[in-house]
């Protein structure tokens, strides 16, 4: 008790490839801690196929994706789509990929993107022995939808994103109906 010691190995695997039917991307993360097996984890960050149709006018992407709603990769109030690994680097928490179906179509001087998220990934919380933990095991998350507490991961959620370049500025407008992972 009171000692904070750890010995861990973090590995990331990234594979990207183009095919006649589209673009495939896989990115996964694995962490093994020799002193605290409760911290061992493996999860998908990105694993999707990206295909274009109608002379590249319609882009459909399906699979697990990480979203960064901020172009600068800094804190952003709307950056709530992905579940988080709270037992990772505090300055840049790892995100878990979310199962996604998206369709992107060009409009005016930008794009309109529709998102469907059928499943909520569970965030990873620090173990009771972690330096970031509370000294007790944190239970699996529950979510509140329409004033009802639920624990099922399969819940339909959606989002709309409009990107536009107007004059010399880039603008993003979005609407998200989802379960907040934070």
Walk through the language-model features, giving the residues of each:
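Transmembrane beta-barrel outer-membrane domains
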Residues: 4-10, 39-42, 92-96, 151-155
